[in-house]
């Protein structure tokens, strides 16, 4: 599988959906965080965040990066499930009061149903907002089950850095709450058996993270100390009326006192209040769920063999979520030392500080080396003496023969359809590699873009358009005219890539012989023909 991390993706510079989506996914996580921090009595604010702000954002993500669309709903479900404010307070007061129960099993089931329903509302709202996209988008993809799974070594190699942070973070919250080590060991043994039977090493690594994170956020004690109190939440002072927490999981006012214990906060053997994990644990559980999901389900498509593309696009989201969660968790390990936390105080304080320093230094090596040319090179792409945020400025330096023509296309009114040679991965027009630059750099639609469209549209659709383009450029004038009319083409672009692709034909490029096709603009290396649709 492909496993790109964000810095590599941005340095590589492919403006793929998996690069454009993370900022919007993190915006969705931010809205969920705002919901998480909102007091229970602010019902309409929470409803507005959940049902007013998230659905339009989900709809936007459906268009920008469809892979992230269901993830927004997943974040919404987990946030409603784990937030300090009880899920049922989202319902009308009379309904919430009627559904109130002392049976923790029914309460947990009700919470799951409301959280799932909230996610469904986000999905439906997103579908409505992005309806035009779904109505015109073509897809021959389908879900498939039980792909070849990742080995333990590969998973540790890709996710090991995050595990180095998340495991001690969860342990320091979990250890003080353990009441029965044997029961805990038995549960871990069950996880190991499941991993063995499912032949999925990911189950062994990530199911405990999900289970411990879930238990810390939902239940008062971990296995062994649960008893009849399993339905009680850890957070002190948690009522349907008032609940507010800070970013790191503490009270909004930063205070803890004896009243917290009286209100239901867990205590250790010394009577010290047990701190609870923050919203970063929600992101941790979300990312672990995504990693586990792609071990069993994948999208069957033509963008790569098996689950290659599914892992690629899903892990890009995991990186975004876990990078934020990992930063908060690492800061917690270094700075938060108090009674009630495991791995805290004494020799743990300097040990964790050294650990954090080594971790940051070791994981920063790639960035330091990869960015060297961005600050010490005067190549055609990296101009350190005159830096710019304009990602298209390189065209004038690297492709001066086509720069003026591309600027002309960029200045066209509206969105007229043009034709270009099918693009390849690298822009090298004289070697049959144009990358559809007149279209990709301007946003003007072209009949056929680069070959990666095969993964989106299918091999047959791509081949059909490729053959139609060859006919437009080199075929019989009458056949060319019919295709220009079918695709509503306004301009035909003939540059280095088009000459390399079609110029070797028997009669070369013959589009100029089509009635209604005339030269609109010409440069030394590029000729742009205008198509008069009324004369075709």
Where are the regions a protein language model picked out?
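Membrane-interface helix-loop junctions at the exits of transmembrane helices
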Residues: 64-69, 124-140, 193-206, 215-225, ...
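Membrane-interfacial loop-to-transmembrane alpha-helix junctions, especially the N-terminal start
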Residues: 42-51, 109-123, 175-188, 270-289, ...
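Membrane-interface transmembrane helices that cradle and orient dolichyl/undecaprenyl
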Residues: 28-46, 78-86
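Hydrophobic transmembrane alpha-helices of multi-pass, membrane-embedded glycosylation machinery
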Residues: 73-82, 208-214, 330-334
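Extracytoplasmic
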Residues: 345-354, 358, 362-536
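Membrane-interface alpha helices of multi-pass inner-membrane proteins
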Residues: 9-10, 51-64, 189-196
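Membrane-helix boundary/interfacial segments in multi-pass membrane proteins
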Residues: 7-14, 18, 136-157, 199-204, ...
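Signature aromatic-anchored transmembrane alpha helix within multi-pass, membrane-resident enzymes
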Residues: 112-127, 187-188, 260, 334-369
